[in-house]
């Protein structure tokens, strides 16, 4: 899939080195095809790392995607330069009159705070409410998934006694749903979180369907009845070294952190981590774009976007 980015987005060069087709604005302007408009609300502190991971994950179908990165205006980022944000990001005020085929809300390192204590919580609530009418399908990741379940359904999160950290095996629960088409019976995905949403709380809402879960990591993937809201409890977009970098960071801080589960060969953190989740992560993003965005967005929704010239 061609990913359309700004000409000088820093991660563009890395994607091109990986043979991922990245189309800059100049070339895209000469393409007479329908492209998907995807908004990515990037709440992660290392924004450029997350940009790379998600763009890589979106690059595996023939559909052309134009990405708009969105940041919060009520929280000042401390790990990403202001010049980068000003150049490559929009705020909610900038995009609120636009219509998007799909939206992604990322995780954020604020799990141990109550939702209402997060300084940008009101803004995220506004975005999630707006998404009901202005984004045809929204993919929520990790904390973004927990926040979405809390906002839309009132489902609480629970603090874990120990951080859920590593790569866990999951089982597909409902093969009839296109979102898991092509998945193996058992697949792996990374988790890095201090909180969880209990299955018993989800089951109180019959409008939600659990699609995959783990004996060790709990519910991984669920969605509403029409695929407008999809929730992923882990990080299928993570690259090989993301958990390693988090592990080394926390060790340097002197935190009580266990080695990531099922990650290093022979549990030896001097060895190259095993990449066991890339194919299923790619399938998940491809299925979302194809079955819940590209094939489902009605003409009337697209026309709303074209009427206002966005």
UniProtKB/Swiss-Prot annotation:
The record marks 111 as: Important for acyl-CoA specificity. Pathway: Amino-acid biosynthesis; L-methionine biosynthesis via de novo pathway; O-acetyl-L-homoserine from L-homoserine: step 1/1. The record marks 192 as: Important for substrate specificity. SUPFAM superfamilies: Class I glutamine amidotransferase-like. Gene3D superfamilies: 3.40.50.880. Transmembrane segments: none annotated. Its EC number is 2.3.1.31. It comes from the Bacteria. One of its GO terms (cellular component) is cytoplasm. Belongs to the MetA family. This is Homoserine O-acetyltransferase. It comes from Agathobacter rectalis (strain ATCC 33656 / DSM 3377 / JCM 17463 / KCTC 5835 / VPI 0990) (Eubacterium rectale).
């Amino acid at each position: 899939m061609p990913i359309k980015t700004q000409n000088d987005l820093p991660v563009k060069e890395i994607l091109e080195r990986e043979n991922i087709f990245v189309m800059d604005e100049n070339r895209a302007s000469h393409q007479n095809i329908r492209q998907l408009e995807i908004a990515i609300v990037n709440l992660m502190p290392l924004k450029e790392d997350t940009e790379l991971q998600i763009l890589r994950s979106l690059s595996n179908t023939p559909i052309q995607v134009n990405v708009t990165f969105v940041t919060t205006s009520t929280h000042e980022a401390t790990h990403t330069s202001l010049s980068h944000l000003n150049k490559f990001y929009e705020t909610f005020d900038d995009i609120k009159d636009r219509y998007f085929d799909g939206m992604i809300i990322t995780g954020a390192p604020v799990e141990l705070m109550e939702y209402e204590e997060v300084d940008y919580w009101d803004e995220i609530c506004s975005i999630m409410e707006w998404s009901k009418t202005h984004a045809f399908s929204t993919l929520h990741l990790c904390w973004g998934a927990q926040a979405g379940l809390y906002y839309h359904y009132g489902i609480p999160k629970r603090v874990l006694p120990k951080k859920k950290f590593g790569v866990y095996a999951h089982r597909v629960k409902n093969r009839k749903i296109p979102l898991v088409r092509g998945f193996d019976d058992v697949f792996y995905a990374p988790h890095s979180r201090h909180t969880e949403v209990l299955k018993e709380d989800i089951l109180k809402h019959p409008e939600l369907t659990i699609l995959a879960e783990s004996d060790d990591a709990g519910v991984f993937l669920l969605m509403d009845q029409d695929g407008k809201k999809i929730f992923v409890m882990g990080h299928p977009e993570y690259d090989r070294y993301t958990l390693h970098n988090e592990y080394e960071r926390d060790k340097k801080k002197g935190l009580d952190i266990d080695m990531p589960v099922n990650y290093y060969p022979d549990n030896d953190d001097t060895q190259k981590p095993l990449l066991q989740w890339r194919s299923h992560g790619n399938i998940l993003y491809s299925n979302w774009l194809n079955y819940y965005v590209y094939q489902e967005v009605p003409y009337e929704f697209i026309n709303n976007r074209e009427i206002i010239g966005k």
